[in-house]
Amino acid sequence: MEITVVKGDITEQDVDVIVNAANPGLLGGGGVDGAIHQAAGPDLLKECQEVINRIGTCPAGEAVITSAGDLQASYIIHAVGPIWKDGEHQEANKLASCYWKALDLAAGKELTSIAFPNISTGVYGFPKKLAAEVALYTVRKWAEEEYDTSIEEIRFVCFDEENLKLYNKLINSEVV
């Protein structure tokens, strides 16, 4: 399994599934969430509304999967990251859960490639370095435990230069 880091637009990634940094209502918003909803087209919003009607809101640390609308990917996994308060409200655990559950959903569909944004590091205010450490630790731990998986590539798609530098530094570190 290959873990890669790129700078770019998550909506343009040539992968089986992209992960959306969603809000609990799954109805789009700003940042990555808004960009994905806009690029995927109106059918995504309709499908997300159906999911919410069925399950209610999606709490932080949880994830659901939908089709990808007009995107190149086949699916979108909507992972609801935590809002950073002070680090004393299980924020790191909830963030790790987003990555773990997204990987479980992708593996459950026998997909081979998944692209993650930098979940919770925008308006949700999660410290970028800690978020990168949690993300890389979690996907590596998942890969160790789920070694017999269809997933061949886990890609982190960084929107900004700061996250790109953090991920590139940490990906080569044995600490994470």
From Swiss-Prot:
Coiled coil: none annotated. Residues 1-175 form the Macro domain. Belongs to the MacroD-type family. Disulfide bonds: none annotated. Gene3D superfamilies: Leucine Aminopeptidase, subunit E, domain 1 (3.40.220.10). SMART domains: A1pp. This is Macro domain-containing protein LMOf2365_2748. SUPFAM superfamilies: Macro domain-like. PROSITE patterns: MACRO.
